[in-house]
Curated annotation (Swiss-Prot):
This is Putative threonine dehydratase. Its EC number is 4.3.1.19. The keyword Isomerase does not apply. PANTHER family: L-THREONINE DEHYDRATASE CATABOLIC TDCB, THREONINE DEHYDRATASE, MITOCHONDRIAL-RELATED. Its cofactor is pyridoxal 5'-phosphate. Belongs to the serine/threonine dehydratase family. SUPFAM superfamilies: Tryptophan synthase beta subunit-like PLP-dependent enzymes. GO terms for molecular function: L-serine ammonia-lyase activity; pyridoxal phosphate binding; threonine deaminase activity. It comes from Sinorhizobium fredii (strain NBRC 101917 / NGR234).
Length: 332
């Protein structure tokens, strides 16, 4: 087990102090509808209220603030499915650095556009996160840019851990946390923080049922590659990296379960958030709600926290989902 999971609560506090001028402490609100549905208090952690519309700003900010002035001056670079790129672009602009974001052609145009608005250089490369990562590594070697990975880095995970700390502070009796699972930065960070304070709390990762790289890797016992598909939960796409050094070990050790939801269930989560919670969520942000609505996670044994991780959905697509239209996605 990697030593990162055993970092002290003081280290989480240092990360929180480091980023507090740049990120919001997001609300944790009770969901009346989900509480009535499950018979258990369900509270929603509104991470989509962050300045860039997702939790990713925490880790990106924590990482860039620990670079030397000379490294910041040369610039930062990352591969991204959208939200990390937007967060890193925002954080770079805030400290006077420049960002280059490499993405595949699966990233929705609305996310690409928002990154460009923040002044970042955008490179669209290939049809997978792995293709984008190859371009990142090329530019690191050629231009001396500092790579800020989207999830598999101790500074990123430490920033995301502050979400877990805030959940426990706001809900001391938390018995279960549901959160989106992709590369594992959020899941590893939140799980480590919550279990440090509430060892018996269950942490459930939720992801889409097509191209679930972390689940496949946990089942195999080592990182594996999976095919990427278009999905309502587009920001959960991409692999975990065959040389994954941090999040795979932590997720395998700290997650109590990983649950898969399909496109229809993700759409139902988006609709529920809008109609009953008055929240606009992207697909990845709604997977925890989807898991409860579908009955794939039974909320019992105490209070449940659900992390709503992001809101950066194309509004045309959001209207289609609210109106009951689920776009067909590629099967091969």
């Amino acid at each position: 087990m990697n030593e990162l999971s055993n970092l002290s609560l003081e280290s989480i506090e240092r990360a929180r102090e480091r980023i507090e001028e740049h990120v919001f402490r997001t609300p944790l609100t009770t969901s009346r509808s989900l509480t009535e549905l499950t018979g258990t208090q369900v509270s929603l952690k509104l991470e989509h209220y962050q300045r860039t519309g997702s939790f990713k700003l925490r880790g990106a900010t924590n990482a860039i603030l620990q670079l030397s002035p000379s490294d910041r001056a040369r610039g930062v670079i990352a591969a991204s499915t959208g939200n990390h790129g937007r967060a890193l672009s925002y954080a770079a602009k805030a400290v006077g650095s420049r960002a280059t974001i490499c993405m595949s052609d699966l990233v929705p145009e609305n996310k690409v556009s928002e990154i460009r608005k923040l002044g970042a250089t955008v490179r669209i490369v290939g049809s997978s996160q792995d293709d984008a990562q190859v371009e990142v590594e090329r530019l690191v070697a050629e231009e001396g840019l500092s790579m800020i990975p989207p999830f598999d880095h101790p500074h990123i995970i430490a920033g995301q851990r502050t979400v877990g700390l805030e959940i426990v502070e706001a809900m001391p009796d938390v018995a279960m946390v549901l959160l989106p699972l992709s590369g594992g930065g959020l899941a590893a960070g939140v799980a480590a923080a919550v279990k440090a304070l509430r060892p018996h709390a269950r942490i459930i990762g939720v992801t889409m049922d097509r191209g679930a790289a972390m689940k496949a890797s946990i089942e195999a016992g080592h990182p594996v590659q999976v095919k990427e598909y278009r999905s309502l939960a587009d920001s959960l796409g991409g692999g975990i990296g065959m040389a994954n050094a941090w999040t795979f070990q932590m997720c395998r050790a700290l997650l109590d379960d990983v649950v898969l939801v399909n496109e229809g269930e993700i759409a139902a989560g988006i609709r529920h958030a809008y109609e009953h919670e008055r929240q606009i969520l992207e697909g990845a942000g709604a997977v925890g709600i989807a898991a409860l609505l579908s009955g794939k996670v039974a909320a019992r044994g105490g209070s449940v926290g659900v992390v709503l991780s992001g809101q950066n959905i194309d509004m045309g697509l959001h209207r289609e989902v609210i109106n009951g239209v689920v776009r067909a996605t590629e099967e091969d």
